[in-house]
Design a protein with these regions (language model features):
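S-adenosylmethionine/decaboxylated-SAM
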Residues: 10-37, 52-225
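Conserved alpha-helix/loop element of class I SAM-dependent methyltransferases that forms part
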Residues: 41-54
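N-terminal auxiliary segments of SAM/dcSAM-dependent transferases
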Residues: 1-7
Length: 225
């Protein structure tokens, strides 16, 4: 129990020879992430599938924190020759963003202040295709980002406002078949994440699937060929 088996494509056919390198990116400075192999493999398999079948579209993460999952996305952005947008305040939650978030305790607020732009850049690496968007979202959106299209987006902001803003911004810019992963949808710790996704589903008349990672990621795919 508690043991995550690796995909057959990896164990039997060595289809993902980059795994050891990506696992180091995923766990650097944060060994707890090594427990959530379901999330890592979900990212790896879906990113490779989308980028391998779509010739256009950048990657992005909204909610970079220390940069571990962004490092994984940036790895594949480099491999497939795509841009990678990284959006965060890099100082934790802004007070205006957590107004009305009844489940956000002082402890949760403090837990995300132990980062910085400099730390995230060290973790993610210096790929020339990285685009750093610093500040509150959507104010941090650059003209280049606004004009771009996206193939894969990770939204990991925990709270309602930036998740809702992120879905509103990225969805119309997704290429057909592109995917958005929203972390913490069914974790129980962040009801604002659930609310933002559910409102988006109703408004856009779309459905996705729940992934079985530790915090219950909700995965959306843009319709079309």
């Amino acid at each position: 129990l508690g043991l995550m088996l690796q995909p057959n494509s990896y164990t039997d056919f060595n289809a993902h020879p980059e795994f050891d390198e990506v696992f180091k990116l995923w766990t650097q400075g944060d060994n707890f992430r090594g427990m959530d192999l379901a999330r890592l493999w979900s990212l790896m398999l879906n990113i490779k599938h989308v980028l391998g079948s779509r010739s256009e579209g950048a990657l992005a993460e909204l909610g970079v924190y220390k940069g571990n999952s962004s490092a994984v996305l940036s790895h594949y952005a480099r491999k497939f020759g795509r841009k990678m947008y990284l959006a965060d305040t890099f100082v934790g939650f802004d007070s205006t963003q957590i107004e009305g978030e009844t489940a956000v305790s002082d402890g949760k607020v403090a837990a995300f202040k132990d980062t910085s732009l400099e730390l995230a850049k060290r973790v993610v690496g210096d790929y020339e295709g990285n685009r750093w968007c610093v500040g509150m979202f959507p104010d941090s959106i650059s003209p280049e980002m606004r004009d771009d299209s996206f193939a894969f987006v990770s939204i990991d902001c925990d709270i309602y406002q930036p998740i809702a803003e992120g879905l509103q911004f990225f969805w119309p810019r997704m290429v057909p078949g592109g995917m958005i992963f929203v972390h913490d949808y069914s974790s129980g710790h962040w009801p604002g994440a659930t609310q933002a996704v559910d409102e988006f589903r109703v408004r856009e008349k779309v459905e996705g699937i729940l992934l079985s990672d530790l915090s219950g990621t909700y995965a959306l795919a843009k319709p079309g060929q």
